[in-house]
Amino acid sequence: MSVSSVRVQVGGPHVFYSHKVMDRLVLSTARLMVREMSPSDLLPLAAILQDDGVMYAYGGAFSAAETEAWLDKQLRRYAELGFGLWAVCLNDTGEMIGQCGITMQEYNDLTVPEIGYLFARGHWHNGYAAEAAMACRCYGMAILHFNRLYSIIRITNVASQKVAFRIGMRPEDTIVRHYRGQYMRHIVFSAGID
């Protein structure tokens, strides 16, 4: 078994740990565990991705096939890059309540690291998205050595914009993306090494 531990501290009381245990990345916060997904996460993932309310920023709920493809894409990202969107679970119960992580996205003819997050509706307004996103921001800068991280958020998704502000990101641009047959305006948020 390969075990290593890295302690990453961000200003204030926030301390996050990353562990690599048997090649499965884990980030821990006070209330959350952020881990790689596996095929056994398909059902809790489907509960999130197939909810119209959660997925409005993506143009609506995913089908079963789109959900499976989404999970497969994350598993490929882990294998190819060592990161992607991870499962976010409650420390006390182990319940998967959302996803958060870092993916590579196209922006202004560049490929940039983006922090993304999606949470089950029953777990909104608890600060979980900001807690997980801050852990991912720390990981992206301290462990993956990105100098700048982005969040590209649909202009109508005010809740996600608030999360970006809470983790220290600021708007830098507005773009239009074509996704699932729709043109959608997005705000590009970013944060660099402080």
Task: List where the protein language model places each region.
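Acyl-donor (CoA/ACP) binding surface of acyl/acetyltransferases
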Residues: 3-55, 85-194
